[in-house]
């Protein structure tokens, strides 16, 4: 850790043994720091049969990685364009790093913070983006049928073959919001699908079929629970699998420096019929900056709609 924090411009060559705890440490540092570049080389050495080297890393924790490993390099991921917030810039950099891989991603953030928009930005080259809210699945049967699909005659009402959401998202991204609402049974089945082969293909099976279908899609999960709360609600193995690449999205009350930008973005995206200019009254902006906005973008949207109605009303009154 000391080496990486003091030698930021060096392209290291790292020698590790395959399958060891050292390897896991290296990949954790790689995924969390983004300091390492494509010039960093990992070389597999001999297979170490002894236990002694592994013992040095038994107490290693992700939390020990210093924050100064996270570089200030630019990012191609711009959900928060021209942000002045360090926490939002970190979201951009993390997403930029993760979408270059085929790994699943977990978005953690409060309601109304725009998790679906961030997930949508992870889609490459106009490929498919499929989304579902896990809270909408009434029971396990519906959840399984929606996710994995079914064959004709698999159950009462199955009048024809139907693709599941996983197949629909083949080649693209499947976004599952409120993942904490999935039952343990569905988590177990989904966990099996997450076990990909060497080519990063998933194997899924429709209800009523004996045939496995290979697909390739990225799963982006989202929750408004904290990580500790989520851990209590998910199967341990499923939890361990989906928290490997976590992106924490800051609430609007923690990104005051971007409040004007957020206001302008919300206003422009509402598509008012008369297309009024974005209000930039000093008193209004100062007031907006004082708001906590616990509903995040939804609260800001309500304010914009309310303001537009009464601004137009006042303008029309002046003309009378």
Give the label of every model feature segment.
Residues 154-160, 197-206:
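Short gly/ser/thr-rich secondary-structure transition/capping motifs
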Residues 1-13, 37, 316:
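A broadly used, surface-exposed interaction patch
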Residues 76-156, 172-173, 178-180, 251-256:
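Conserved post-Walker A coupling segment in P-loop NTPases
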Residues 11-72:
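Interdomain "pre-motor" coupling segment immediately N-terminal to P-loop NTPase/helicase cores
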Residues 6-8, 33-42, 125-126, 272-275:
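Structural alpha-beta junctions
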Residues 100, 118, 123-126, 207-218, ...:
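Nucleotide-binding/hydrolysis machinery
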Residues 139-145, 161-200, 217-221, 227-240, ...:
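Conserved AAA+/SF3 P-loop NTPase catalytic/coupling segment centered on the Walker-B
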